[in-house]
Amino acid sequence: MSDSEVSNMSDSGSEDGSISNKSQRSARSKSRSRSRSGSRGSRSVSRSRSRSQSGHSRSGSESPQRRDNRGKSDESGEEEEEPPGEDIDSEEYDEEENDDHPRKKKKKERFGGFIIDEAEVDDEVDEDDEWEEGANEIGIVGNEIDELGPTARDIEIRRRGTNLWDTQKEDEIEEYLRKKYADESIAKRHFGDGGEEMSDEITQQTLLPGIKDPNLWMVKCRIGEEKATALLLMRKYLTYLNTDDPLQIKSIIAPEGVKGYIYLEAYKQTHVKTCIDNVGNLRMGKWKQEMVPIKEMTDVLKVVKEQVGLKVKQWVRLKRGLYKDDIAQVDYVDLAQNQVHLKLLPRIDYTRMRGALRTTATESDDSKRKKKRRPAAKPFDPEAVRAIGGEVHSDGDFLLFEGNRYSRKGFLYKNFTMSAILSDGVKPTLAELERFEESPEEVNLEIMGTVKDDPTMAHSFSMGDNVEVCVGDLENLQAKIVAIDGTMITVMPKHQDLKDPLIFKASELRKYFKTGDHARVLAGRYEGETGLIIRVEPTRVVLVSDLTNHELEVLPRDLQLCSDVATGVDCLGQFQWGDMVQLDSQNVGVIVRLERENFHVLGMNGKCIECKPTALHKRKENRHTVALDADQNQIRRRDVVKVMEGPHAGRSGEIKHLYRSLAFLHCRMYTENGGIFVCKTRHLQLAGGSKTTVSNAGIVGGLGFMSPRIQSPMHPSGGRGARGGARGGRGGFRVTRDREILGKTIKISGGPYKGAVGIVKDATESTARVELHTSCQTISVDRNHIAIVGVTGKEGSVSTYGRTPARTPGYGAQTPSYTAAGSKTPLVGSQTPNWDTDTRTPYGTMTPSHDGSMTPRHGAWDPTANTTPARNNDFDYSLEEPSPSPGYNPSTPGYQMTSQFAPQTPGTLYGSDRSYSPFNPSPSPAPSPYPVGYMNTPSPSTYSPNTPGGIPQSPYNPQTPGASLDSSMGDWCTTDIEVRIHTHDDTDLVGQTGIIRTVSNGVCSVFLRQEDRSVSIVSEHLAPVLPCNGDEFKIIYGDDRESVGRVLSKDGDVFVCRINEEIKLLPINFLCKMKSID
């Protein structure tokens, strides 16, 4: 139990408790006042006795003498008792008690003498100094210091220090010291008597936070909720204030310029965690609170007054009011009035009547108008003002209207307060400069506000830029930037006499460009685009964009040299490049170019317009939209088509969008509008589509017969054309699906997707729908341009022309019917009058119609074979000879074109034991024409990949007879090459040379220079013109097909050529002369 606790127990009246030190000190003080002249030894004995009594009090015993002293102290009254812990200076407190109680003071005077009074006065004057010196010497606890001749004063000082340590608590000692030095100013203690005269800056140093002050803790907060969170924590603090567990934070700080953080003042981090617990806005800072260093704590609350340094002709913007966000130029600055005189474009409502023209009706109309209607910014027009009743007065060089001053050029000059303008980092756009100045060349683009937060943002210079000095003695000196340090630029001069780097301010330099440089736009309307500089002016640079080939006018400060080419922006918000958008209720368009603020939209009329994103609505398309091309083929999105008529005739492209009778196409070879153009669907032709016309469809569908040239699969178009006639009797233009190729992996060997690999999703006789592996895109491809991966042979090995042998008149004797049954079972051929046994036709008793081995070759299928001469476009021999002929021998079951085509029927492919007809061929009249067409019967031979005339022994891989002849025809033809017409029906054309303009399905459009016209000629009538030394050529065969080069020399059967800066040897027949430029 401590001494103070024992003292408290004795004060409460306990008889058995120990006597407090306070009572002992009171008793000793009284005895000392009565016998102050006692010897040093008596004091030592008293001090020893006091310590022994204190030790006895800790054990709980009490001597009779101490009880007597306690009784004497009790007699003096309870008001004379001192509170525990304040008897550090007993004499000082005794005198205070004497002032309050004269009776005690009289007792002190009764026993005092002259020498004692002097000692007491001396003690009162030097009491603090003695205590201070004693404390410094003994360090408050001086029990182990040897007493080397101590005086009475030294002993008393030691006694006081000992009592201070033994009897008082730490907080009581701290309170005593604070009271003792409270009357002395901090400045006086640190700086002596002259501290009061110190400056405020020096005295403020003493108020800086120290290690004993609360710390600042930085807590992450939700951005924008800093002040609201601080108020929330204040309410939480007040709520917990009267509870058992109040919050231990001292303050909350949410500085104005700090985003995403607040500061809490507290002694410990745990106090901060308790405070921010369950606060949603501080969820991000729950696990991490960063303590601010002591030296940086003052910077949190430091307020720096910004000095506005405006310059004349500096660009600024208005913050509020009618001219909010408008560009303005500083005319002069009035710092005394805190105002700035600006020059800007006025906003005057020329529709509101003024003066005498203002009537009651106009006032009522004005009240109905929107209050915050903002007129357009344009130069002041005095004539327009007078027209609405306004009065314009002249004041020297200015015009006065409604209290405002206008220049003769139409600009408004007006005073604004400093707080109403924004001057930091203002950069006017080129459009604003053109409207702001009558002559843009006079505009000073370099005067603008600087950004104080980041000095590097005050300029757009970067390493390696070419600059020139614009002010000073070295004006017009060209240099190259080698280092940048804030606003200080280090450059290497381009001068023979200057070899050392020079340092300039950023305001003293400007960028320098020359014609032919490749640069990137850093800011403005065309930000991110690259192009080639074609013209340099003092205040602007003109360059051609790499993406659009349009001229761009850019400020020099917004350019930077670069070597790469921009890829462009393909999306902005909800819109992307190539999207179809709704312009109005009747018109649509396609986005062909995206800029920062505007879209370039290609309309239905083929014109490109600029639109704001807010004025457009994205149109939702149906992916199943279908239209008809010029040949009445169905076309849909992603189909590859060719333009046959109109301004874009000859171009090929992919359908991006279909809208009513219009199609938006994308062509990689078209440079304008991003490669997108619009055409009418009736001007298009599907790549690989049918050429069946409406007139032919009617004839074929009704009669079922066509000429051999059209009907025979020898010609690809003929085979496709016969499809309508064969289906005419049962549903007209029904499309036959080729299920045998579905799901197979193929490779495209021609067209715009040459080399692509995909899976066949759907197929007809002429077209296949292929899903590409690379882009998962489904496209339509001509069947002649695909080859099955893993199958040897040329493309077209999967033939569509041989599935119905009856369609080929030349093979009627070899393959009697659609199936092999006609040649194997005579009963069928002799008893079945038609395909279906239940078909009761008037022709049932006629010659068997399906047993082709008993009829002439063409008799069963084409009544015109022996009567009408056929065209000789497809064969070297003549078809005009009467039947029988060497080319068409009706007595021979096979096709006697050449020996390499051995006769074979489709039945042998499927294990037929008898693949020929047992009946000998005999001439018989052709059957009467049937009024309807024929349907394919589902049999294996219907989808036979091998047809007559195409056996594996042939050098042509299994394919249709027509494909075997036409497989190599027209493959070499391409555009912009010179060709010679070696054969043609028109003898006047034979021998002429021309230039191929377009190629479509083996038909070339050739421009004849002699006749100055274009003719359409089948590619088989053309021959390439060989180049000579020095001529440009184009490769027409091989892996490098379509490559362009120049002939250097000829060495036998090869040419020495230069292609892309490489020297190569190429065969003669691989090259064709390109068109010569006259």
From Swiss-Prot:
CDD domains: KOW_Spt5_1, KOW_Spt5_2, KOW_Spt5_3, KOW_Spt5_4, KOW_Spt5_5, KOW_Spt5_6, NGN_Euk. The modification Phosphoserine is found at S73, S76, S90, S707. GO terms for biological process: negative regulation of DNA-templated transcription, elongation; negative regulation of transcription by RNA polymerase II; positive regulation of DNA-templated transcription, elongation; positive regulation of transcription by RNA polymerase II; sex-chromosome dosage compensation; transcription elongation by RNA polymerase II; transcription elongation-coupled chromatin remodeling. It comes from Drosophila melanogaster (Fruit fly). Residues 309-336, 460-487, 513-545, 635-668, 740-773 form the KOW domain. Residues 718-732 have a biased composition (Gly residues). GO terms for molecular function: chromatin binding; mRNA binding; protein heterodimerization activity; protein-containing complex binding; RNA polymerase II complex binding. SUPFAM superfamilies: Translation proteins SH3-like domain. Phosphorylated. Phosphorylation by P-TEFb alleviates transcriptional pausing. Phosphorylation by P-TEFb alleviates transcriptional pausing. Dephosphorylated by the INTAC complex when transcripts are unfavorably configured for transcriptional elongation, leading to premature transcription termination: dephosphorylation is mediated by the mts/PP2A component of the INTAC complex. Belongs to the SPT5 family. This is Transcription elongation factor SPT5. Residues 920-930 have a biased composition (Pro residues). Residues 350-461 are annotated as: Interaction with RNA polymerase II. Residues 76-99, 117-135 have a biased composition (Acidic residues). Residues 213-307 are annotated as: Interaction with Spt4. It holds the Pfam family KOW6_SPT5.
